Design a protein with these regions (language model features):
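Hydrophobic alpha-helical and helix-loop surface patches within well-folded domains
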Residues: 1-287, 295
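Beta/coil-rich, acidic/histidine-enriched accessory regions frequently appended to metallopeptidases
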Residues: 171-418, 426-428, 432-435
Length: 435
């Protein structure tokens, strides 16, 4: 409770009430001003599972957090459920992450499977759906708004700008009744950013994030220098493998070998051989170039064009992780505005001094991309597992109880062993006395 009061006050405004009571009752979570109830409870023997531990911590944070949303920032939860449950769940996530490292929050990557499946399902609804019409309350009012606001904080605005804007919203509207547009306008006004595209996609639309690398094109500068270009083309041609028919036809006798008089100039001619005409043409070209154009021809580097496709329809920033042949990496971040003229597909040029071996979209899993397999170029091999399983009676997952039982068993075994050794020592016959 104290942790919640401290963190929520930091992100919004100081807690204005004299007390905050949390009751661990055998009932579902429910909040009222200054008091709330929540479960789960430990077992009768005092043990509890990992799920019980973190479930209770999370629900305490959540229910105590409702003192801010909607008790003080008094939005209409009967109309716009996400304005209290979603904003509160978002602050709950921030508070959980400062409880301990790698806290298992709902929007951690390993727990997002259900949400990602919902985001790409045909039955999804916009966040801006009236509360009475929602069919997936958990996703629409709690988890999706949490995910959206975290992306806005981490990948769009940045923490400093977002935290300032969110605090301004909370302070401007404490003890008042804001609507969704009040929230949207305040966030834009306080951050100084036009976020219409973000609200439209995440809150009014049902599109999802699925950005695919469709292709990567590798370009090299055509210097027009025959000593470079023709030799490079010849090396590339010579490196090509023979077709199957060429390989099978090699041992066959050829008529021109039997009758050499059939050969002419073109039997020995190679269009990639350097000629005097090539040399003269190149010299003429160089003389007609400006110093800037000459410098461009001499530039050493690799030119790549990455074709990206927005399969999910949701406009998002693009994060590219580029891996080079020497194993070094570079991260390129492109703002969402890159989709402004062509929201369905774009191409991005990368100029590098080294050869690229791999490109990955969303390497930090920050944009909720529903299909990460098309994020790689070249594509990675998918790994799966299979095994043998037998049905068994389900048992509760309570490692703490299992540990205590194992310790109790070991203690009893040690006592039994000690008891047997004592009995054995007692029953030993005394050695006969020497005469």
């Amino acid at each position: 409770v104290a942790h919640t009061l401290e963190l929520y006050s930091r992100y919004t405004f100081d807690y204005p009430y004299p007390v905050a009571i949390s009751v661990n009752a055998p009932v579902g979570g429910m909040e009222y001003p200054m008091i709330c109830w929540q479960r789960p409870r430990p077992e009768k023997d005092g043990t509890y599972s990992k799920r019980t531990k973190y479930g209770l911590i999370s629900v305490i944070i959540h229910e105590v957090g409702h003192n801010w949303f909607p008790m003080i920032v008094n939005s209409d939860e009967r109309q716009w459920m996400w304005m209290d449950e979603g904003l509160n769940s978002f602050l709950q996530f921030l508070t959980e992450q400062e409880w301990e490292a790698d806290y298992p929050s709902r929007i951690m990557p390993e727990r997002m499977g259900g949400l990602l499946n919902y985001l790409k399902s045909p039955n999804k609804m916009p966040i801006m759906t009236g509360a009475d019409s929602l069919q997936s309350t958990g996703y629409n009012a709690y988890t999706k708004p949490t995910l959206a606001l975290n992306i806005l904080r981490e990948s769009v605005l940045g923490r400093e700008q977002f935290d300032y804007a969110f605090k301004q919203y909370a302070r401007r509207w404490m003890f008042k009744s804001p609507t969704p547009t009040d929230f949207f306008r305040t966030m834009e006004d306080a951050s100084g950013q036009d976020l219409d595209w973000f609200w439209r996609g995440w809150f009014y639309g049902t599109e999802h994030t699925d950005i695919s690398i469709e292709n990567v094109h590798h370009y090299k500068m055509d210097t027009r220098d025959p000593y470079k270009d023709k030799i490079a083309k010849k090396d590339k041609r010579n490196a090509e493998p023979d077709r199957l028919f060429q390989k099978l036809n090699k041992p066959l006798p050829k008529r021109v070998d039997a009758f050499p008089e059939l050969k002419d100039f073109y039997n020995e001619y190679d269009e990639l051989d350097i000629t005097d005409k090539d040399r003269a043409s190149y010299e003429k070209l160089i003389k007609g170039l400006s110093d800037k154009e000459k410098a461009m021809l001499k530039r050493k580097g690799q030119f790549y064009v990455v074709d990206l496709k927005n399969l999910g329809g949701l406009v998002m920033p693009v994060v590219l992780k580029v891996t080079y042949e020497d194993k070094s990496t570079e991260e390129i971040r492109l703002p969402a505005q890159i989709w402004r003229r062509h929201p369905e597909s774009i191409s991005k040029m990368i100029v590098a001094d080294k050869k690229i071996t791999r490109i990955e979209v969303d390497p930090h899993r920050e944009t909720a991309d529903v299909d990460i397999e098309n994020n790689y170029f070249p594509r990675r091999m998918r790994e799966h597992t299979f095994g043998i399983s037998k049905s068994k009676k389900p048992s509760g997952n309570n490692p703490l109880r299992d540990k205590q039982k194992a310790e109790e068993k070991a203690r009893k075994e040690a006592e039994e062993k000690k008891k047997k050794e004592a009995e054995k020592e007692k029953n030993k016959k005394p050695a006969p006395k020497k005469k």
